A protein has these predicted regions:
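Gram-negative bacterial Sec-dependent N-terminal signal peptides
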Residues: 1-24
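Mature soluble binding/inhibitory domains
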Residues: 21-251
Length: 251
């Protein structure tokens, strides 16, 4: 897949949002501040008080709280509840944060400062504000020149279940192409595309949900030897199906 279709490129430009600092790469499937989307990911901006974290680390913010000032994911995780599936949950009804901030489900790639998950304003299935995101530190500055690598990945979509979608991501550094799949309770997704080392997204291509719904897949590699991966699959106006995913090289 050396040339992405015009439809895929249009989806990519109109719906995905990319953010990069010296240390952190982030993306989300819907634009902050548009159509009720109040979540924003990027580098941490807050280094004092109870939400302190290292400036530049992976961070997350909400428009109702200090106009979207981002706090570190490490701090955010400490205020969430980890469920039996290893997913951190934070909802407006909890006492850990102010009301009317929506529902979060997110998790962390093992042994890495790479986070992925989703948010919606109400947490009710069908909420069009649903936004998938990832934010990671130590993006891979160079990728392997050859070889095939399999990653064990998990996905997050709060409307699919409170757990994780399971799957694999296969990078062929010889042909500079990738394939992948994610399986959940209601969502079954395949993806494929090109590995583009010098682009903002180091992999970029297509996705198909439930054998018929066309979408976009994109993301980045992390670690000194591309040991981790994180990305998003998004489906145009059907944002309730958007999934964030991440994982590590299979053992």
């Amino acid at each position: 897949m050396k040339n992405l279709s015009l439809a895929v490129l249009t989806i990519a430009l109109s719906t995905s949002v990319f953010s990069a600092s010296a240390t952190t790469i982030s993306a989300q499937s819907q634009k902050y501040g548009v159509d009720g989307v109040e979540v924003i990911v990027g580098d941490n901006q807050y280094a004092s008080g109870s939400h302190a974290g290292a400036i530049g680390d992976p961070g997350i913010g909400l428009q109702p709280i200090f106009f979207g000032t981002r706090i570190s994911f490490a701090s955010f995780k400490a205020r969430a509840t980890e469920n039996e599936h290893g997913v951190y949950e934070l909802a407006a009804s909890t006492s850990a944060h102010s009301a009317n901030t929506g529902k979060f489900n997110f998790t962390q790639v093992a042994n890495a400062e790479v986070y992925f998950g989703d948010w919606s304003k109400t947490g009710i299935d069908g909420d069009a504000t649903h936004t998938a995101f990832y934010s990671g530190k130590d993006v891979s500055e160079s990728l392997p020149n050859s070889g095939q690598v399999e990653y064990t990945i998990a996905g997050i979509n709060q409307f699919d279940s409170s757990g994780k979608l399971s799957g694999t991501f296969n990078a062929d550094f010889d042909t500079k192409e990738y394939t992948g799949s994610l399986s959940g309770h209601e969502l079954n997704i395949t993806m494929s595309g090109d590995i583009l080392e010098q682009e903002q997204y180091q992999f970029n291509g297509t996705a198909i949900a439930n054998e018929s719904i066309e979408g976009h897949s994109y993301g980045n590699f992390f670690g000194a030897d591309a040991t981790e991966v994180a990305g998003i699959v998004s489906f145009g106006s059907e944002h309730i199906k958007d999934v964030a995913f991440g994982g590590s090289k299979a053992q």
